[in-house]
Amino acid sequence: MDYLQITKSPTLQGSVSISGAKNSALPILAATLLSQNEVTINNLPDVADVKTLAKLLEHLGVNITWHKPTSLTCLAENIVHTRAIYDIVRKMRASILVLGPLLSRFGYCEVSLPGGCAIGARPVDLHIKAMEKMGADIQIKGGYIIAQAKGGLKGADILFDKITVTGSENVIMAAALAQGKTHIINAAKEPEVVQLCEILSQSGVKIEGIGGNELIIYGTGGELLNFAPICVIPDRIEAGTYLCAGAITNSSITLENVENNHLSAITDKLEEIGFGFNKSEHSLTLLPAQSLKPFEIITTEYPGFPTDMQAQFMALATQCEGTSVIEERLFENRFMHVSELQRLGADISLKGNHATIKGISPLLGADVMATDLRASSALVVASLVSEGTTNIHRIYHLDRGYERLEHKLQHLGVNIVRLKS
């Protein structure tokens, strides 16, 4: 099994190109199930999760041609299965995204209950209740969601009790081919959701309210869609992770291929800590701070501070002068990285969904274990300032969401190698 070995790094320098957003690529891939034409998708991130979903689509009967690791063409005219099997779905929670498109197009599907990061319960109840509201009969048997909509899905008023990104995306795709109007209240408005809506809108689905938390979708009544070529938006979480790597070493680095307006919550917090920025249309340069001030974070839905960045900022907090506080409001059990950061010497105390981090903590390299995707990136960030050598194990979590991580970090001057145990 692979692991990463990182030796304390000097000040970083140079530039890094940000990959396409994994969390946009996955619903876009699922949405190709709604198409009647060949769909070309560019700027895909070369990560395990994208390959997993592509494999699932191929199992269903989608013809996929890879042009390069970041570009493919899908043709979904000959779907032969509507059963998303456990062997593939168990590897990634986002596989649930095929539920809406399959049910909307075929009126029947079976989708294995998903796997992925072990972060709290993250139930699929919200997806199921919404589909039932649209006329589906759903049962859970033998670890599968078995969904049937005789006569097809019908538009409905969907009120999400809690904002859910994948739930919103699933219902948006289900509503695309449904009969009549679907009104989604309390929809997620992350950039990845917005891109999905924009693509469907350009493909023949009338959608009102894009970018807000109320959406009205006029379904095509079963008529399949025509997609133009798609370019996946840049990954704001990957960008934020590299900003934290630059920040913890108090370096000046440049990110290329970014959407600065998607990064406001992250860059605002870094400015509060003491960093500056030079911004141009699609690039961003981090400027060093005179000193690193402590901070407070409350994770919340977009445009608030993203839960996918709290672990990396926790690593950064160990080098800030004073006490920082992080409150996690979106997911339970999302502090699993704390014990591993403590192994490096971090002074962190937990109380419920609050973490208190005292800095400045001198960190010392050790063997640590990744527990989920973003927690593993926090260990990478912390290891950059840890004396000696840090070995990060179970990095298959990193490979799920970060493209060529060690190569990009090496380009910035990090002493990092991938080894086999």
Swiss-Prot record:
Q: Which GO terms describe its molecular function?
A: UDP-N-acetylglucosamine 1-carboxyvinyltransferase activity
Q: In which pathway does it act?
A: Cell wall biogenesis; peptidoglycan biosynthesis
- Main localization, broad class: cytoplasm
EC assignment: 2.5.1.7
Entry superkingdom:
Bacteria
Cell compartments where the protein resides: Cytoplasm
Which Gene Ontology biological process is one annotated for this entry? cell wall organization
Family the UniProt entry places it in: Belongs to the EPSP synthase family. MurA subfamily.
Q: What is this protein called?
A: UDP-N-acetylglucosamine 1-carboxyvinyltransferase
Residues annotated to bind UDP-N-acetyl-alpha-D-glucosamine: 93, 122-126, 308, 330
Q: Which keywords fit this entry according to its UniProt record?
A: Cell cycle, Cell division, Cell shape, Cell wall biogenesis/degradation, Cytoplasm, Peptidoglycan synthesis, Pyruvate, Transferase
Record function comment: Cell wall formation. Adds enolpyruvyl to UDP-N-acetylglucosamine.
